Amino acid sequence: MPQLRAGTDSEAMNPAARKVQRIYLTLTLGNTLAASFIWGINTLFLLDAGLSNLEAFAANAFFTAGMVLFEVPTGVVADGWGRRVSFLLGTATLSVSTFLYYLLWQISAPFWAWAVVSVLLGLGFTFFSGAVEAWLVDALHFSGYDGALETVLGRGQMVSGTAMLIGSVAGGVIAQATDLGVPFLLRVGVLLAMFVVALWLMHDVGFTPERSARPLQATRAVLSASIENGLKNPPVRYVMLSAPFTAGVGIYVFYALQPFLLELFGDRGAYAIAGLAAAIVAGAEVLGGWLAPRFRRLVRKRTTVLILSGAVSAVILVALGFTREFWLALVLLAVWALVAEVGTPVGQAYLNDMIDSRQRATVLSFASLTGSSGGVVVQPLLGRAADVYGYSASLAFSGVIQLAAVPFLYASRRQRAAADEAHGR
């Protein structure tokens, strides 16, 4: 299949490709802004509703379980009905489920209700997980773009990080000035606006949905082809097997940082400080997106970046677990996030260069599913560790768990896939 160059080429971005990139960045900006309003205060929101640490992270695990359950079906929707349809369903589902979350907080609902709505939130996000990236890659190929995937994906990460920076800080400040529920209502409003924007701007190009009068048969066919391109493709399979350790830990750490930093700061009501954790991650996402294609040009293989990113970020997590100074914790948090984010666009480009267009959304959803499955197991376990031993210890445990991803990434490297070096079409 066609592969894009690892370097940057400004002349490769023709007018059609620039239009595709603008739409992609617009969708990324709106979606991330909507989501990030609550990222800095979500754990505090759940604890404020009366849940324990174990229940709060178990609710997050149900959200992740929803992603595991629906990743493949929604990927099939994207490949069978179109990436635009999938995106619109995602905004609608997330709007409704976020508002239900707000209502549960209002009435201090029992845990089972949080579990149910968390699964619905997971469903909403799975409509996005493979569809937007698949739409971008196919549209770029169709437009004749001959540059590096890392470049465009890195720009998307920079826009996402900027939106996350704005949204997470705003969410924390607004929560402190009003209450913890208002950021959730803001998320609903922005998601509804993004539904209108996507309806207007986003159209499937370079890809024809394979609809069928027999949806179950079509689902089996797409799923079978996706397994061939995914789990039965060794370099892709090993990347997928690394995901439960990297993504599963990443989900827990992101939300555990909120109460961890408040504990170090000494004021559990300083919601703006909790937003600061998300803001630091967002800033690292911006810088990481900018650095990724540049760092990629310094090494011969993409897996070099992935292995270094996974190993170094794991060691930093262990160090963070032994930190008792607030400002030192912020520095380690920033370095951890930056190292992790440099690897993200490189990993995305590596996978996309090994996947056939017809099953792209479903295989990418498979990859997301494996990461989410790790979160289902890791979050309750580490949440329980936080209850028993404290947040510091749980972060150190997180680093140890993440190190288990490195052998799988090395195994992918040993397959010598062409996408690992990808220097031309």
Which residue stretches match the model-derived regions?
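Helix-loop junctions on the cytosolic side of multi-pass membrane transporters
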Residues: 194-215, 410-422
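Cytoplasmic helix-loop-helix junction between adjacent transmembrane helices
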Residues: 118-161
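Symmetry-related core transmembrane helices of the 12-TM Major Facilitator Superfamily/SLC fold
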Residues: 181-200, 395-411
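Juxtamembrane intracellular "pre-TM" segments in multi-pass secondary transporters
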Residues: 4-18, 203-241
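Helix-loop boundary and gating motifs at the non-cytosolic
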Residues: 14-69, 235-278
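C-terminal ends and interior cores of transmembrane alpha-helices
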Residues: 88, 92-108, 311-324
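Hydrophobic core of transmembrane alpha-helices in multi-pass small-molecule transporters
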Residues: 29, 97, 110-128, 328-342
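C-terminal transmembrane bundle of multi-pass solute transporters/carriers
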Residues: 57-59, 69, 251, 260-425
